[in-house]
Amino acid sequence: MTFEELKNEVMTQMENKPSCWRNGQFVFNYIDDKYNVARAVQYSDKVDCFYDDKNIDNFLKHAAKRIE
């Protein structure tokens, strides 16, 4: 899966995110639930968007590589 494909998928699903969640929380949980690679990106690749929304694109780039 390409970064662009994954980003489009996640951004489409983000319309359904709980209002109390930040975008990074949603992205992390969505990737973890659907693809089970979020923790590998967080701990092995050292990219965490759960606590920092500025890392969303970089997180998705690393996740896309792991999903391929």
Identify the function of each model-found stretch:
Residues 18-53:
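Acidic, low-complexity, intrinsically disordered interaction modules
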